[in-house]
């Protein structure tokens, strides 16, 4: 089939012989093929987007896997060739990894945007059995998580935005939805449109001073840099 023929051609060219033995495939070969595969995918998608929709930014495919994607210099190097902004769904950490964020910029040369992150409150009355976000005890804790997480994004200097996932809680009465997206407190409003005011107040507190916070963090960073060069 076409896929096998393409892989075989790539592998033979990499090994420099025809019908290179499959039993000699190494981890380095697997890594190289992953990079080749991703580059091919990104190139084809980008060519079509640039042709038919040249005036919009391409945000990519929302990286999510820690070791396979978010800690991979090769993946980010490819992403930097094609994406305008690199999109990332950020889970499984209480705050973004500062070293990773610095590496993303170094590896790709592009800014990033966080396209998903959230926590679920145990005081919501929902079971919170589904979803990638972790559980916290209260809506206030959700708000403090938000403030800390976003502050670290701003501290990085290379984040251009963030999206809380999601606007509304899963409706526990709607059994037609996917079971993995049915019973959790992900939203800033409940499934009946009642706002989580404690959470929203904490979010607003940070959002209202975002630019002042950026200036403060940049000044602190510049001050630290001056000290290291003295």
Positions of predicted regions on the chain:
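Conserved residues at the C-terminal ends of beta-strands
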Residues: 89, 162-165
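Short glycine/proline-rich turn/loop motifs
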Residues: 17-30
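Aromatic-rich peripheral "rim/lid" segments of glycoside hydrolase catalytic domains that contact
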Residues: 165-230
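Histidine/acidic-residue-rich catalytic or RNA/ligand-binding cores of hydrolases
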Residues: 123-133, 174-183
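Glycoside hydrolase catalytic-domain groove-lining segments
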Residues: 23, 32-47, 51-131, 151
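Aromatic- and acidic-residue-enriched segments that line the glycan-binding/catalytic groove
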Residues: 1-19, 172-189
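Surface-exposed substrate-engagement region within the catalytic domains
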Residues: 132-152
């Amino acid at each position: 089939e076409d896929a096998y023929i393409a892989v075989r051609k790539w592998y033979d060219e990499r090994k420099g012989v025809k019908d290179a033995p499959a039993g000699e495939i190494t981890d380095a070969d697997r890594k190289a093929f992953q990079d080749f595969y991703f580059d091919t995918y990104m190139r084809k998608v980008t060519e079509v987007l640039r042709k038919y929709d040249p005036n919009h930014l391409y945000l990519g495919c929302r990286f999510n896997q820690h070791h396979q994607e978010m800690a991979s210099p090769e993946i980010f190097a490819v992403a930097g060739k094609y994406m305008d902004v690199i999109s990332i769904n950020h889970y499984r950490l209480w705050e973004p990894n500062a070293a990773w964020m610095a590496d993303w910029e170094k590896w790709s040369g592009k800014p990033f945007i966080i396209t998903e992150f959230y926590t679920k409150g145990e005081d919501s009355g929902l079971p919170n059995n589904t979803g990638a976000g972790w559980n916290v005890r209260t809506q206030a804790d959700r708000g403090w998580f938000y403030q800390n997480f976003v502050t670290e994004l701003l501290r990085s200097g290379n984040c251009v935005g963030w999206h809380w996932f999601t606007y509304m809680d899963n409706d526990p009465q709607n059994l037609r939805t996917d079971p993995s997206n049915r019973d959790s407190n992900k939203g800033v409003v409940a499934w009946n449109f009642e706002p989580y005011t404690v959470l929203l107040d904490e979010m607003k507190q940070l959002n209202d001073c975002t630019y002042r916070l950026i200036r403060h963090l940049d000044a602190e960073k510049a001050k630290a840099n001056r000290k290291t060069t003295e």
